[in-house]
Amino acid sequence: MEQAPEDQGPQREPYNEWALELLEDLKNEALRHFPRPWLHGLGQYFYNTYGDTWEGVEAIIRTLQQLLFIHYRIGCQHSRIGITPQRRRNGASRS
């Protein structure tokens, strides 16, 4: 089986650098939508559970992504993404 030499192909950012940048971006976005003390408690939970490990970084990235997705989907006031409540004049619902 043919393989490309290791020094060819697109340059990729090291995984740990990418993960830390992603975590920083998610943290900043989460701070716009959730209370700081609540996020601090969440961070403490992950630190107490995983310690200072990459497994903990991956777990908090997944959790923040899920929280933000659900928050947007429910209908964040800061975003146009999500389910917009529809008003009905006569109260009838369409199924």
From Swiss-Prot:
The modification Phosphoserine is found at S79, S93, S95. GO terms for biological process: DNA-templated transcription; monoatomic ion transmembrane transport; protein homooligomerization; regulation of DNA-templated transcription; symbiont entry into host cell; symbiont-mediated activation of host apoptosis; symbiont-mediated arrest of host cell cycle during G2/M transition; viral penetration into host nucleus. HIV-1 lineages are divided in three main groups, M (for Major), O (for Outlier), and N (for New, or Non-M, Non-O). The vast majority of strains found worldwide belong to the group M. Group O seems to be endemic to and largely confined to Cameroon and neighboring countries in West Central Africa, where these viruses represent a small minority of HIV-1 strains. The group N is represented by a limited number of isolates from Cameroonian persons. The group M is further subdivided in 9 clades or subtypes (A to D, F to H, J and K). It is found in: Virion; Host nucleus; Host extracellular space. Residues 1-42 are annotated as: Homooligomerization. This is Protein Vpr. Its main location: virion. Belongs to the HIV-1 VPR protein family. Homooligomer, may form homodimer. Interacts with p6-gag region of the Pr55 Gag precursor protein through a (Leu-X-X)4 motif near the C-terminus of the P6gag protein. Interacts with host UNG. May interact with host RAD23A/HHR23A. Interacts with host VPRBP/DCAF1, leading to hijack the CUL4A-RBX1-DDB1-DCAF1/VPRBP complex, mediating ubiquitination of host proteins such as TERT and ZGPAT and arrest of the cell cycle in G2 phase. Phosphorylated on several residues by host. These phosphorylations regulate VPR activity for the nuclear import of the HIV-1 pre-integration complex.
